[in-house]
């Protein structure tokens, strides 16, 4: 019984995370960039058609 409840909770949490990522990446990634920009990072959408996951990465500019 506890295993069933645990699996159900994990599935609900993961589906909520994916829905949020799809929302952030649905309009070409501008919302993802805005979301990640709050932490001084750059948002990159990737996955199927570039709409599955919003990932925040640190951007380092090289000075020559």
Curated annotation (Swiss-Prot):
Keyword Secreted: yes
GO cellular component terms listed in the entry, alphabetical order: extracellular region
Key words of the record: Disulfide bond, Ion channel impairing toxin, Neurotoxin, Secreted, Signal, Toxin
UniProt-recorded Gene Ontology molecular function terms: ion channel regulator activity; toxin activity
Localization terms from the record: Secreted
Source organism, top-level taxon: Eukaryota
Disulphide bridges: 25-45, 32-54, 36-56
Tissue specificity field: Expressed by the venom gland.
Signal sequence extent: 1-19
Protein name: Putative neurotoxin-H
Record organism: Lychas mucronatus
